[in-house]
């Protein structure tokens, strides 16, 4: 603690300097906040929120992994289509064969073989053969057609799930961008606050040396400065945490972030229209609806097991050295097979019942997801309206806190206010600055949340400077592929 021995009075010069200080303090803190205002002009080399969202859209590992899942799901369609196509097989065999044959001849009257005869024949052959078989399913209870439609619905559901992930990543990127701006602005406010409190302590020491205040006033100033320093350290730690999360989500370290603005212009203008859009277009809802389609088709696929199966088969076979008597043999065949299931243990009936229950579960899930989407819209809408009102209130709070601090400082010079009053007024101004920073942060974040809730938070809707990923490109590349093990990307 500073003692009275090293406190030098400043007399009239000190009093004149004290009277002028509130203006400089307010300008310093106000300028720091103004530099962060969302309406401030952007620097030429500043990183914009659109650029950050574009980086996350291209590089986020969760989003890229979900795209790979969609490509994997695309392959279920050609797998299902394979049921329409013929199956071709080729076979070949070769071996070494030793045979012993005993031929018995019946008696022939009037010849030397009146008693009959038995002849033993030993043989050695090396038989080999080759052939081919083609089969085609003609009817299987429409299981193939339903499998194709189910696979197509699964692809559609996977695409909607990709939209869910895209919205999640873009919302996370927008939120961390605003968190970074908020925490950087808060750190600057805390730094200015410490500088102000440090000067306040110096002035209080000088007034104490002049006999104008007591040691209690000095202790109050010291306590407030220590509290300000603690808040500064906490703000520094929070900024470091936010920087790490920014890199995790966006893919690069944050640097020179430009001010951001609300995107509510892309959202519906009324709550009712937002609810209608969210319950119809939110990708979580549409993905659940495709889930119902898949479940219904699974019922039809299971019912197909009760129908007859009709297949056609053709084969050719060439054999050499099958035996001594027939050194060469060629066979060909064409058959049509009809299989009618009569009773298969009851498993197919259980499968049908289970799939019908799955339909009910999926329908309930749609209702649940739609209710959640509605709640998300209402929540985001309320948060956006609250943030807009909070900005107006915080702006009035800042103006009033500035006037109050000016008045308290001036009144303190004539003994009408104590040091504690000055410290309280300074803290009130800091709180007002923080309230405005948080309100501006919340308005931007809640506007992105509203877009996500109504299903409009996408790179295409935001017109981000990035090439939009189009899942249909890969789908068309593999849908009708009959052969080939390499993926369209070359893997």
Predicted feature residues:
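Periplasmic alpha-helical coiled-coil/stalk elements that build and connect Gram-negative outer-membrane
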Residues: 2-7, 12-13, 17, 166-279, ...
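Sec-dependent N-terminal signal peptides
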Residues: 17-32
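C-terminal segment of classical bacterial N-terminal signal peptides
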Residues: 32-43
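Bacterial Sec-pathway N-terminal export signals of envelope proteins
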Residues: 42-93, 99-100, 137, 254-293, ...
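Small/polar-residue-enriched beta-strand and adjacent coil segments characteristic
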Residues: 48, 87-165, 286-369, 376, ...
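Amphipathic alpha-helical coiled-coil segments
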Residues: 65-80, 165, 169-189, 199, ...
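Solvent-exposed polar/charged
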Residues: 82, 248-251, 304-305
């Amino acid at each position: 603690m500073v003692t009275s021995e090293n406190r030098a009075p400043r007399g009239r010069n000190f009093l004149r300097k004290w009277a002028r200080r509130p203006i400089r303090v307010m300008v310093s803190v106000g300028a720091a906040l103004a530099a962060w205002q969302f309406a401030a002009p952007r620097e030429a080399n500043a990183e914009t929120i659109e650029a950050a969202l574009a980086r996350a859209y291209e590089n986020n590992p969760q989003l890229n992994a979900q795209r790979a899942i969609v490509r994997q799901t695309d392959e279920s369609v050609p797998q299902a289509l394979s049921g329409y196509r013929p199956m071709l097989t080729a076979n070949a065999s070769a071996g070494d064969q030793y045979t012993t044959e005993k031929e018995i001849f019946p008696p022939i009257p009037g010849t030397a073989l009146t008693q009959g005869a038995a002849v033993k024949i030993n043989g050695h052959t090396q038989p080999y053969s080759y052939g081919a078989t083609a089969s085609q399913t003609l009817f299987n209870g429409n299981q193939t057609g339903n499998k194709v439609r189910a696979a197509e619905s699964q692809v559609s559901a996977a695409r909607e799930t990709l939209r869910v992930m895209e919205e999640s990543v873009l919302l996370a990127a927008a939120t961390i961008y605003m968190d970074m701006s908020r925490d950087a602005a808060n750190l600057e406010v805390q730094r200015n606050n410490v500088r102000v409190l440090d000067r306040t302590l110096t002035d209080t020491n000088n007034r104490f040396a002049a006999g104008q205040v007591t040691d209690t006033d000095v202790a109050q100033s010291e306590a407030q400065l220590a509290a300000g320093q603690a808040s500064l350290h906490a703000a520094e730690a929070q900024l470091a945490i936010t920087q790490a999360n920014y890199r995790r989500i966006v893919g690069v370290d944050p640097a020179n972030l430009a001010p951001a603005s609300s995107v509510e212009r892309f959202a519906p203008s009324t709550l009712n229209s937002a609810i209608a859009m969210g319950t119809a277009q939110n990708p979580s809802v549409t993905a659940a609806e495709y889930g119902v389609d898949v479940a219904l088709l699974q019922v039809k696929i299971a019912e197909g097991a009760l129908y007859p199966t009709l297949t056609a088969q053709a084969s050719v076979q060439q054999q050499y050295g099958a035996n001594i008597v027939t050194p060469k043999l060629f066979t060909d065949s064409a058959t049509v097979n009809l299989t009618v299931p009569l009773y298969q243990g009851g498993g197919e009936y259980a499968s049908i019942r289970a799939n019908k229950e799955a339909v009910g579960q999926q329908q309930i899930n749609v209702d649940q997801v739609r209710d959640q989407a509605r709640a998300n819209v209402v929540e985001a809408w309320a948060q956006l309206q609250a943030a807009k009102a909070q900005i107006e209130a915080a702006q009035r709070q800042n103006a009033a806190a500035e006037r109050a601090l000016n008045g308290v400082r001036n009144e303190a010079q004539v003994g009408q206010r104590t040091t504690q009053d000055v410290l309280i007024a300074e803290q009130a101004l800091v709180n007002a600055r923080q309230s405005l920073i948080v309100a501006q942060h919340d308005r931007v974040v809640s506007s992105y949340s509203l877009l996500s809730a109504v299903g409009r938070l996408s790179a295409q809707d935001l017109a981000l400077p990035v090439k939009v990923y189009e899942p249909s490109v890969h789908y068309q590349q593999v849908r009708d592929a009959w052969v080939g093990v390499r993926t369209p990307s070359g893997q």
